[in-house]
């Protein structure tokens, strides 16, 4: 998927689609051989295919394996289908330091920030988009420019003095 996203970031849409189609084919072949590729296919469909299909796949996977990677992917797929309130519940799980063993993912934090922005929660959105770029300023050739653009749109928080 990363190669497709690199191609997409370079404006090579046809080459990106070839990579996404190849990934779908390989994941389906692996499933026929007994592997579970629901997370891979769900992530792919959420961003580069059918988000509703991603939600379907990832809900089943969540029931089987409720980990942080699945929580992130399901939250993102829900966001992509317009279900932002439920999406935030899963994004919060995916970015919970205790549930993730203390590991922070720039992509997971980015997803949470985008979902919060969609819900007009500008303070948390700004904080999480900034955190994603701080954790890894190169986490995605597609998402880093988006995070920077969204931060610019959100602007700086208002400066308020003490009450009184």
Label each region the model flagged.
Residues 1-2, 30-40, 65-72, 102-109:
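Generic helix N-cap/helix-start motif at coil->alpha-helix transitions
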Residues 26-30, 65, 98-101, 136, ...:
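Alpha-helical junction/boundary sensor with strong preference for TPR arrays
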Residues 37-50:
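Alpha-helical segment of the N-proximal tetratricopeptide repeat
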Residues 10, 48-49, 81, 119, ...:
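Structural motif corresponding to the intra-repeat A-B loop/turn of tetratricopeptide repeats
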